[in-house]
Amino acid sequence: MKPIRVKVKVNGRVQGVGFRHFTYKTAISLELTGWVRNLEDGCVEAVAEGPRQQVEEWLAALKKGPPASKVAGLTIQREIVEGVFERFEVRF
């Protein structure tokens, strides 16, 4: 299956609630590559590459988030697959 790449910005109560770790663990379980980081505006940004079905499952999980979070919305951009990531990581 051909991989896809998405860049997502998550807004709401998503910092200080374990959202990056949740994003990371979910991506690892789905065998995706990419990264996640907090933004200064209080949002979380992430990029993921992998098979369409796994990326869609990951996005569905991000819409819910971990129990302490309150996701207000996701902005999702499709990007060109670059294949530059070896794993999924948390960036600081």
From Swiss-Prot:
Catalytic activity: an acyl phosphate + H2O = a carboxylate + phosphate + H(+)
Top EC class for this record: hydrolase
InterPro entries, alphabetized: Acylphosphatase, Acylphosphatase-like_dom, Acylphosphatase-like_dom_sf, Acylphosphatase_CS
Domain Acylphosphatase-like: 5-92
Protein name listed in UniProt: Acylphosphatase
Record flagged with keyword Hydrolase: yes
Stated family: Belongs to the acylphosphatase family.
GO terms of molecular function: acylphosphatase activity
Assigned keywords, A-Z: Hydrolase
Active site: 20, 38
Hydrolase keyword on record: yes
TM region(s), chain numbering: none
Assigned EC number: 3.6.1.7
